[in-house]
């Protein structure tokens, strides 16, 4: 199963400390994780880039890796130029290429 979470995963990537702490303190409340912490599941998903803040996207890229990010448009309310927004970030060109199409192509089995 391939899952892409909208809006950069929302609060999920930024809430990991709390989830891991609660998991450690109350393992009886978490079932079927195979002993894994919630943060260990983060890279199982893909995330779109509709976060509207370069600092937030930077944290997301650091936590999940740029290979898990796909460009999102958030149509009809999103960035007027979502590709240009990604290109304007302080990312290596190889990461920009992955985010702007390479990752989606891989995710969809197009190459």
Please place each PLM-identified region on the residue numbering:
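Mid-to-C-terminal alpha-helical segments outside catalytic/metal-binding sites
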Residues: 46-47, 51-70, 76-111
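Catalytic pocket-lining loop regions of alpha/beta-barrel enzymes
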Residues: 1-70
């Amino acid at each position: 199963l391939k899952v892409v979470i909208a809006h950069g995963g929302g609060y999920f990537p930024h809430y990991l400390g709390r989830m891991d702490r609660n998991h450690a303190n109350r393992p009886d409340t978490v079932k079927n994780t195979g002993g894994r912490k919630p943060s260990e599941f983060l890279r199982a998903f893909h995330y779109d880039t509709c976060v509207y803040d370069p600092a937030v996207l930077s944290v997301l890229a650091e936590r999940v890796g740029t290979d898990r990010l796909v460009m999102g448009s958030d149509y009809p309310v999103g960035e007027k130029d979502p590709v240009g927004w990604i290109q304007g970030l302080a990312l290596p060109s190889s990461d920009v290429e992955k985010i702007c199409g390479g990752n989606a192509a891989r995710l969809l089995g197009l190459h």
